[in-house]
Amino acid sequence: FPYTTLFRSLLAESMSKYMQDKFRFLGVRGATRTEIYKKYFPDARKTKTIDWDFVESCWNKEEREFQYVVVYYLKAMQKFLKREDISRLKYLIVTKSWWDTVDLLAKVVGSLVIRIEGYDQIMLEWSKDSNIWLKRVAILYQLSLKEKVDKQVLERILVNNLGDSEFFINKAIGWALRDYSKFNPEWVREFIEKNKNGMANLSIRE
C-alpha cells in the first residue's frame, strides 16, 4: 500500500492526539484511505481467499493506518472467513486494541458467528472474559442484524456485563440496546425496566 508517500506530519500528529497518543500515524485522511481500498480490494475479493500473511504484515507495522487496512480488508473479505479464523480475529482484537479497530472487527466477527452453529457460545465466553475488548465485541457483534438478533444470547451477554465500571463496556451496552430498539423497542424497554438498577447511567443515556 502506498501510504509512505502520503506522510503529512501535522495531520499525523492531530490524528495521534485524537487517539490519545496511543498510536503513531502517517497522516492519511479517511477519504484517501477509502480511495485506496476501492482500488485494491475488488481484486482481493476475486481470489476468494483471505491472505493472512498480508494481514499479519500490515498488523505488525507501527503506523495505525496499516491496522485500518487490515480491518477494512477483512470487512471486504468477511464472507470468505472460515470457522478456524475466529482465533485469528481474537488475536487482532486483543492486540493493538482500541475502539477504532475493535468496533469494525466486531462486525467481521458477527458475520462469522451468525454463519457457524454454536459460535454464539464463544461470544458468551468472551462476554465474561477479563479483556474489555473481547467483552465489547461480544456486546456489539449483533449490531444491525435486526430480526436475526438472538435475543436470548444478547440478554445473557448484556446481563454478564451489568455492574461493570468500564466506560467502553457501558457505552457498548447502550449502543447495542439503542440499535436493537429500532427493530424491537418493546424488548428493549422491558430489558431496561427489568435491569435498570444494575445498569450504568451511561448505558441508559446512550
Locate each region found by the language model.
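Alpha-helical scaffold domains
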Residues: 1-206
